[in-house]
Amino acid sequence: MSFVVIIPARYASTRLPGKPLVDINGKPMIVHVLERARESGAERIIVATDHEDVARAVEVAGGEVCMTRADHQSGTERLAEVVEKCAFSDDTVIVNVQGDEPMIPATIIRQVADNLAQRQVGMATLAVPIHNAEEAFNPNAVKVVLDAEGYALYFSRATIPWDRDRFAKDLETVGDNFLRHLGIYGYRAGFIRRYVTWQPSPLEHIEMLEQLRVLWYGEKIHVAVAQEVPGTGVDTPEDLKRVRAEMR
């Protein structure tokens, strides 16, 4: 099954300026992500960036670049520009791999593509179980609740589902009902084209989660449990220090 990986790599970052180019053990972070995508068996890999320095780093590593505007409000909007510039057919399977995930396993890149291809659904993504209270109550760890067939009911930074009886007694432990969403998405190119025609939803603005736009407009998102748990993503200088140590 063929699929295309697009890696959005926005240069500006309030917490870590020039994030795609930060050095991780001798390579720019974006090159590590490119290498993980290559291991997935993708037919084509494109780094979508708004900065010439990022483009040069990718090209030196033998990667393909698509220059995009700097004013996109989300990674999916950046993907839509690439979809149009590359004239992908509506049924092309696109996997959005975040440019700040240098430790993402190649297996889950392919997993999300396979999950999408096997279903008549606009969008697919992955999640992993949460086993500790710190993560369950962390607003930076996005939680997702599913229906009986694995489709998302809701994504939230809040602790969902709220375990009423357990939490009335104890906020230090959690049960087996919590899933943390992973920021990897599979879509067909035609779905991306439709997504960017929709106005952002109120819930999307409240939670600051772009996938809520999909649920707001009545579309389904399939969520599978990831075959491997990815390593740390890089959002802060502290994350960067940790990733450098883990990737030695």
Curated annotation (Swiss-Prot):
Pathway(s) the chain acts in: Nucleotide-sugar biosynthesis; CMP-3-deoxy-D-manno-octulosonate biosynthesis; CMP-3-deoxy-D-manno-octulosonate from 3-deoxy-D-manno-octulosonate and CTP: step 1/1; Bacterial outer membrane biogenesis; lipopolysaccharide biosynthesis
Provide the GO MF annotations for this entry.
Answer: 3-deoxy-manno-octulosonate cytidylyltransferase activity
> Per the record, what are the reactions this protein catalyses?
3-deoxy-alpha-D-manno-oct-2-ulosonate + CTP = CMP-3-deoxy-beta-D-manno-octulosonate + diphosphate
Name this polypeptide is given: 3-deoxy-manno-octulosonate cytidylyltransferase
Instruction: Assign the protein's first listed, main location to one coarse class.
Output: cytoplasm
- GO annotation, biological process: CMP-keto-3-deoxy-D-manno-octulosonic acid biosynthetic process; lipopolysaccharide biosynthetic process
Annotated CDD domains: CMP-KDO-Synthetase
Give the gene name.
kdsB
What family classification does the UniProt entry report for this protein? Answer: Belongs to the KdsB family.
Which Gene Ontology CC terms are recorded? cytosol
